[in-house]
């Protein structure tokens, strides 16, 4: 008889990966300090000696990136920026490397089609962006010069996802996204902290998006960079049941008793947002960033939440595009995805868009 639940060994493996990726177990003690110093040294060498003339695309390239190992909010920022520019009459293409995807490993240029491609083939974030943006907007290739050259034939503006450390492509505008709850990644390189680049890298960007955290986070960032700051706050746009597409009314969220699973670089921000809406979180099942939950894990977590009288499970949109096929799984609790949007000050938005528009016009595009 086929087992419905994951093995003890697999659950132990999940626990270890979470301890490494989210709890920083590798950063403990003298070994963690040593590994962080080695990583910082390698980054410094890379920054100093790895240099080549960047390819200049025919279109304006806007880079959106960060200095930490995940969880800053790049994908929501790219989606917000693409929509804001669309409302100004600009069509935008998105360039992604497709982190850990089959297409990236095959070095194959892929224009993402959300109806055809899977998260394993193109990557979870490119697939999510393809669902949100007009058809043919998201391009995946490990070498962003190749995707930029092709996408420039169709789009006047290209958004380079996770591009802060990518030097092979010329960037007309650089935007850094920082997590307002930990803007400088614990001030230590991974694994002791969350940095993957030096905070002084923020000095060279054109704008900094402070994702949550408010003015206090802005003050911390101001100590290392005078770049203009734009404060954004992630909020719940809607909560949708995945099995029938029905939206849960906003006023009903405070009555929800659910379990939450997610694979994020900084899951605490997502959990805090749910709690602020009054959602009762009965339990959580955390995954490493970009990891997909398995059918056996869903069965296991659903059983736990059913014993606590849970009404269902919640996950992010990024997790929903990686859900396994669940046809015939009648024992599962219903799953709802949380659709988020960024709340941004209109004056800040206007200032950033005006800067981008001026640079775009100066290029003659």
UniProtKB/Swiss-Prot annotation:
Q: Locate the residues binding ATP.
A: 68-75
InterPro entries linked to this entry: LpxK, P-loop_NTPase
Known EC number: 2.7.1.130
Which keywords label this protein? Answer: ATP-binding, Kinase, Lipid A biosynthesis, Lipid biosynthesis, Lipid metabolism, Nucleotide-binding, Transferase
One GO cellular-component annotation of the UniProt record comes to:
plasma membrane
Q: List the disulfide bonds.
A: none
Please tell me whether the keyword Hydrolase is annotated for this protein. Answer: no
Q: Which GO terms describe its molecular function?
A: ATP binding; tetraacyldisaccharide 4'-kinase activity
Q: Which Pfam families match?
A: LpxK
Q: Which reaction is catalysed here?
A: a lipid A disaccharide + ATP = a lipid IVA + ADP + H(+)
Q: Which family does it belong to?
A: Belongs to the LpxK family.
Q: What is this protein called?
A: Tetraacyldisaccharide 4'-kinase
Source organism of this protein record: Chlamydia pneumoniae (Chlamydophila pneumoniae)
